[in-house]
Swiss-Prot record:
Palmitoyltransferase that catalyzes the addition of palmitate onto various protein substrates, such as CGAS, HRAS and LCK. Its EC number is 2.3.1.225. This is Palmitoyltransferase ZDHHC18-B. Keywords: Acyltransferase, Golgi apparatus, Lipoprotein, Membrane, Palmitate, Phosphoprotein, Transferase, Transmembrane, Transmembrane helix. One of its GO terms (biological process) is protein targeting to membrane. The active site is at C192 (s-palmitoyl cysteine intermediate). Belongs to the DHHC palmitoyltransferase family. ERF2/ZDHHC9 subfamily. It is a multi-pass membrane protein. Residues 80-87, 227-253 are lumenal.
Length: 388
């Protein structure tokens, strides 16, 4: 039998096994929900339908406008149209229905459309603009920073671009900052509380369609109600009996009488602005009409033709929205995965032994000798192998 030598293992040389604690469960990293830009929009606006609808925060008058239109039109279709169809023609409710649809659609488009809000400057862009404006050295006490305006030439007319301290941008031509919505609006006309939104470059055509169609609808209802009461008062009945037989017509008559004049006047005023290619803001300030004292100043945006101005304001292509309110906000947390370090039990035992020695004041014991198992086989000579 072949001889084999074994080296005995000292049991004291073996380190006492230390129970390994169960691995800690790392907290699950829940990914954040991607937020859209309308959720962090800095302006004073309200968004609905996941950012598809935008209105001003102070839009409490809009339900009143919509309610008056629905109430007056509903009373007209219920109480006046049946009598007029019976005694005059069936075209009256058809004409009234077309005007009513135009009014409602144009009102909703004016109220729920982005008027032309300009996005605010990013911190990097704002810092770059501030460097261009302020004194780069600041050493000279007599140095005066340049005014926060820029001058551009449009059709041989100098136009000043003012710096907006809120949006941190130089406003483009015909742009103004609305204090109610807290936004810079391109081709700003005015803030209309009746529609609950600013009127600017992107929704002015809807606003003009709304006031013109509303003036036609109001005048149409006023004329039809007057005709209805006149027909009822014939035959010796009198106006009092006619009002008593149709009290809803009296309410319509009062509402239309007090509103038709203001609506017709507003439609005529904006027709003049469209023909001259002006805005309400420019007309009030007298920027190009000589009211500001500059009599020789002409409107650089006018095409010198009423037809061209009307086509430019009302029939041009619809500009896209610049705020991208349904886009996603870029994630700020750049989480990088790092390699996981795993402690081996042997290394942990060494650390525990050193820690116990330090606390007791004794030098740490030497590490245990490595566990060596030596398996020695006797060398078998060729002679033995051959004789075997």
């Amino acid at each position: 039998m072949k001889n084999r030598e074994y080296q005995q293992i000292d049991p004291q040389a073996l380190a006492t096994p230390t129970p390994t604690p169960p691995p800690r469960s790392l907290p699950e990293h829940k990914p954040r929900r991607a937020r859209r830009k309308w959720e962090v929009f800095p302006g004073k606006n309200r968004f609905y339908c996941d950012g598809r609808i935008i209105v001003a925060r102070q839009s409490g008058v809009l339900p009143l406008t919509l309610g008056l239109i629905l109430l007056t039109s509903g009373l007209f279709f219920i109480f006046d149209c049946p009598f007029l169809v019976k005694h005059l023609t069936s075209c009256i409710p058809a004409i009234g229905g077309v005007l009513f649809v135009f009014v409602i659609i144009s009102l909703l488009q004016t109220s729920f459309t982005d008027p032309g809000i300009l996005p605010r400057a990013t911190p990097e862009e704002a810092a770059d603009i501030e460097k261009q404006i302020d004194n780069p050295t600041g050493s000279s006490s007599s140095y005066r920073p340049p005014p926060r305006t820029k001058e551009v030439v449009i059709n041989q007319q100098v136009v000043k671009l003012k710096y907006c301290f809120t949006c941190k941008i130089f406003r483009p031509p015909r742009t103004s900052h609305c204090s109610l919505c807290d936004n810079c609006v391109e081709r700003f006309d005015h803030h209309c509380p009746w529609v609950g939104n600013c009127v600017g470059k992107r929704n002015y055509r809807f606003f003009y369609t709304f006031i013109v169609s509303l003036s036609f609808l109001t005048a149409f209802i006023f004329g039809c109600v007057t005709t209805h009461l006149a027909l009822r008062s014939q035959g010796g009945n009198g106006l009092v009996n006619a009002l008593q037989s149709s009290p809803a017509s009296a309410l319509e008559l009062v509402v239309c009488f007090f509103s038709v004049w203001s609506i017709l006047g507003l439609s005529g005023f904006h027709t003049y602005l469209v023909a001259a290619n002006l805005t309400t803001n420019e007309d009030i300030k007298g920027s190009w009409s000589g009211k500001s004292g500059n009599e020789d100043v002409g409107n650089p945006y006018s095409y010198n033709s009423m037809i061209k101005n009307c086509c430019s304001v009302l029939c041009g292509p619809m500009p896209p929205s610049l705020i991208d309110r349904r886009g996603f906000v870029p994630s700020d947390d750049s989480v990088q995965t790092s390699p996981v370090e795993i402690e081996l039990p042997a290394a942990k035992n060494d650390i525990n032994m050193v820690g116990r020695a330090v606390t007791s004041g004794r030098p740490p014991p030497p590490p245990p000798p490595p566990l060596v198992v030596t398996l020695q086989q006797p060398a078998i000579s060729m002679q033995n192998h051959s004789t075997a």
